[in-house]
Amino acid sequence: HSITIRNKRLIKLVNQCEEIPGWELFNYFEKGEKHRIDSSMVNDYIHQLSGYNFSAKDFRTWAASKIFFESLSELPAPKTTKEKDKNLLYGIDQAAQALGNTRNVCRAYYIHPTLIESYEDTILSQYFEKYKTTEESTDFTSSEKVLLELYAKYEIRLDSAKPF
């Protein structure tokens, strides 16, 4: 599924949302009355707009993965395991900072696992090359196009899946 949101204010709000049902995001006044907006309302709105069961967390996951990918693409290819680990932390930190999360939370819950695995296995470097030569479209940036291609090849391995 894919949807496009071009409203910058909505994108900013979605990126600030937490997956805590009913978490109050902000209040506003209209005609002298106070109205509250909570995360459930934002998630309902996203569902209504898209027609799919998306939530703010889906957008945060997409954003974190995109930031992680783009951050790593700017770095030179690592020559050692130590450099690879340092680069991974850099990419995770960039995504965590953008989302306002810790490194551990971002890695565990927001960055798509295939990105980290692919970087560790040096597979991601071929996608960095595609990213540099892929043209943007009206619907997707070049990094988003490449990420979708990578995700299409992703398979969940039940033997290594983490329990909830």
Which functions belong to the PLM regions below?
Residues 1-156, 163:
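Extended accessory and catalytic-adjacent subdomains in large enzymes
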